[in-house]
Structures are given as C-alpha cells and as structure tokens.
C-alpha cells in the first residue's frame, strides 16, 4: 500500500504526485484497477505458500464489501491455499461495514490505527499544527474499535491491531477488555506491553466485556480517564519561584 508521494522516486513510477495522496489511488482500489500487477503479487505469495511458508495477506484501504468480494474472487481464482485472507480496518467505512465484510469469508481483520484515527478525526498526523488533537484514544475511534472486535468475535474472525496505538498501555488495556486476539507493538515497547498483557490476562478482575452495558461503561471510563490526563497536562503543577536571597542559601 504505497501512496504516490512515497514511490515517486522508484524506477517506472508515475512522476506526478497526487494533490491528496492520502485519499488517492492506493491500497485495494489500486490493485483492482491493475489486476495484472495484483495477480503477479499474489502469485509470488502463492509460490511461498506452496513451499510451506505460513503467513496471511491483508488488503488495505477497504471501503466496500464489493472490494472484498473481488479480491477474494481473484484470490480463489489463483488457487492460493494455506494463506489467511484478511482486511485492514483503517477507514470508517470498513468499521461500519464489518458485519458484511466478515460474511465475505475473511479469516482476520487488523486495525490500522494511524489511518483510522486520521480518517475518523479528519486530522493529518504529520501536521504539527493539529498534533495536539490527534488522539487514537478519541471517543469516536474507540467506539469503532470496540464494535469491530465484538462483531469479529461473533463471526469467528480473528482481530488484531497494528500502528503506534498498540504500544500505548491505556490502549492495550482497552483492547484486552474488548477481547482482541493479537497486538502488534513497537520493538522498544515489546517488553513493557508483554508484561502488561500478562498481568491483565491473569488478573481475575480483568475480564472480557460481553454485553452492551459493560461496553458502554468501559468506554465512559476510558473517556473520563483520557479527559483527566488532558486536564493534568493543561494544568501542570505550579513551579516555585525562589527568591535571589534564598538561592545563595541553596547553593552555598
């Protein structure tokens, strides 16, 4: 899933960069428009699978059930066996349509939290002017994640998460309570997050949430906690001003 602003220097790549690459021609929409490239990529994966390598393939930028069905049809046409078929949940459209997407016969769904947050909040995380309001723990993002995990559980589809959010302890606690199957983390956070997950999964008080009332209560708790953290950041502890006469006493 490479955008036009990311591959412009590659040999044979189009030289024109789209005005808005983030919302442009990439992901599954590009693959379906160029079936010869798409099939070549899948055949390379098939070759690895036929040699006994175990892996899964997930398709990015899904916004419709039709895209999943078309990708699945090509996947089956090439007789790709022993390869898990999955989708990225990185657009609000995919989150909304998750029930129908699961019914297409997917094996797993993986959250792309970086893009899901950007698309949901209409925020460019690379823009310094709006960094203060870019937040994967935003109420709207969490509600989508919760809904997708619960639907995947019902349909027997595995759920996972990638992106930076999986390295945040507060997000991990939320995900474990929702019942997510796997979490991808940054290498430097792997030890801390692994220990946290072990604690959460062995803590008798931490149980998966299974009903609407508990889900609503948990979301409210996360929202309240997030607001308290932001409030603390906006109102730091007052700094004591030391008079000149006292400075001499301190440093002597």
Placement of each model-derived feature along the sequence:
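Conserved alpha/beta-domain cores
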Residues: 1-222, 226, 234, 242, ...
């Amino acid at each position: 899933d490479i955008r036009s602003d990311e591959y412009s220097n590659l040999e044979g790549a189009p030289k024109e960069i789209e005005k808005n690459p983030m919302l442009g021609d990439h992901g599954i929409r590009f693959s379906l428009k160029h079936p010869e490239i798409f099939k070549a990529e899948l055949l390379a994966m098939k070759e690895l699978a036929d040699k006994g390598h175990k892996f899964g393939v997930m398709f990015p930028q899904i916004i419709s059930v039709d895209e999943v069905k078309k990708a699945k049809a090509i996947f089956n046409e090439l007789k790709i066996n022993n390869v898990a078929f999955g989708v990225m949940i990185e657009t609000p459209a995919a989150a909304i349509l998750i029930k129908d997407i699961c019914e297409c016969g997917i094996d797993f769904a993986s959250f792309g939290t970086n893009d899901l947050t950007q698309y949901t909040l209409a925020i460019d995380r690379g823009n310094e002017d709006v960094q203060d309001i870019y937040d994967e723990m935003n109420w709207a993002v969490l509600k989508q994640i919760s809904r997708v995990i619960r639907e995947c559980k019902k349909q027997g589809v595995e759920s996972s998460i990638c992106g930076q959010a999986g390295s945040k302890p507060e997000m991990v606690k939320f995900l474990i309570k929702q019942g997510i199957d796997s979490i991808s983390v940054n290498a430097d956070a792997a030890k801390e997050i692994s220990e946290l997950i072990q604690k959460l999964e062995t803590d008798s008080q931490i149980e998966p949430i299974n009903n609407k009332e508990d889900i609503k209560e948990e979301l409210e708790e996360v929202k309240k906690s997030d607001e308290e953290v932001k409030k603390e950041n906006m109102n730091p502890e007052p700094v004591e001003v030391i008079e000149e006469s006292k400075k001499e006493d301190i440093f002597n």
